[in-house]
Amino acid sequence: RSIVTAFGVAVAAFCILTGFIMKDSLDTLMHGGLTSSIKYEYLYRLNALEEGTPEQGEALFQNYYEVEGKTVQLLAQGISKDSKYFPDKTDGGDALDLDKYYLTSAAAQTYGIKTGDTLTFSNIADLKEHKVTISGIVTDNTHCYLYTGRENATALAGVDSDAYNCIISKDALSLDKDRVA
């Protein structure tokens, strides 16, 4: 009986300790990992492409791409000039130049790409192949993003250079419900 009780107490203690360890790890991931490269709280995906500058928030162009042989899609983020919602430096401390292309650390690891390598990917809408040279890596261990300027991202997608399909903001916006997907 004593052995069974001692074994039960040991198993219970192990379960409790495992729970504390997992909680700490998940707290670190949720508070540090998911927000490591983005600084906005709200992303509104629009039903249709719009052009220019939105009245509220900041314009963003997003488009999904496939990398051959990989199951994880690449999301290109077309960032507006002087954006306050995206990183401004690479892991190496270099300033981001929105005329170039940068990968998040998760994307770099997933696709096996380093700074200076060429990344080949295809637009999932028209299967057109694109090749870009990666100028740096941005720390973000949860998102497979390709960061570039809005003009570059729209050119990859074959739409007008002033187009956007998302609005991002730190605060909730009052947008027309018919505009938002």
What are these regions (language model features)?
Residues 2-25:
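Short, strongly hydrophobic transmembrane alpha-helices
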Residues 24, 28-181:
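Basic-flanked hydrophobic alpha-helices used for secretion and membrane insertion
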